[in-house]
Curated annotation (Swiss-Prot):
GO terms for cellular component: plasma membrane. This is Cytochrome c biogenesis ATP-binding export protein CcmA. The keyword Cell membrane applies. It is an enzyme of class 7 (translocase). Residues 4-207 form the ABC transporter domain. Its EC number is 7.6.2.5. It is a peripheral membrane protein. The keyword Nucleotide-binding applies. It is found in: Cell inner membrane. ATP binds at G36, S37, N38, G39, A40, G41, K42, T43.
């Protein structure tokens, strides 16, 4: 039994089947990239895995239990960052981290922002930051979270090369410590092929 399992997932949109019979099992320490063409259902699959949407058939299980039976404990173990940064634009970068991690002290939040490349921008309202900087505010949570499972939809959008490298290193560290990372990205990952497992939505049912 793996930590996260997709079992015979079916997803249909507008009378079109995005994927069917999709099954896979993820274990501690895995780093997974969901691949497929535009419109293949990559974001849809991520939302199914987070529990934000329900499949038309099939099940998602966490530690052997369907998500709807373990929703609270699952979400305590999950960090989800979607296409939108999901941050409070009227708050500063530092205030945003305090909002999402109320048990984190200021020093930890400042360190997370520095790791994300936002040193010097901590006290600026988010609505005055660039798109890339706003994305970094959301991604700074990667240095604070205690969640085991990270699900990230295009995390490198609007991030420069140095930022991508830093984020990639953080993901590698997380998986080396037994965490799981699932992501979509159009950018090449600067890591050894042996470290990345790819699940293709162009070959559904055989992932």
């Amino acid at each position: 039994m793996g930590m996260l399992e997709a079992r015979e997932l079916l997803c249909e949109r507008d009378e079109r089947t995005l994927f069917s019979g999709l099954s896979f099992t993820l274990n501690a320490g895995e780093w997974v990239q969901i691949t497929g063409s535009n419109g293949a259902g990559k974001t849809t699959l991520l939302r199914l895995l987070t529990g934000l949407s329900r499949p038309d058939a099939g099940d998602v299980l966490w530690q052997g239990q369907p998500l709807h039976q373990v929703r609270d404990s699952y979400h305590q173990n999950l960090l989800w960052i979607g296409h939108q940064p999901g941050i409070k634009t009227r708050l500063t970068a530092l205030e945003n981290l305090h909002f999402y991690h109320r048990d984190g002290d200021t020093a930890q939040c400042l360190e997370a922002l520095a790791q994300a490349g936002l040193a010097g921008f901590e006290d600026i309202p988010v609505n005055q930051l660039s798109a890339g900087q706003q994305r970094r505010v959301a991604l700074a949570r990667l240095w604070l979270t205690r969640a085991t499972l990270w699900i990230l939809d295009e995390p490198f959008t609007a991030i420069d090369v140095n930022g991508v490298d830093r984020l990639t290193q953080r993901m590698a560290q997380h998986t080396e410590q037994g965490g799981i990372v699932i992501l979509t990205t159009h950018q090449p990952l600067n890591v050894a092929e042996s470290k990345i497992r790819r699940i293709s939505l162009t070959q559904t049912g055989a992932a």
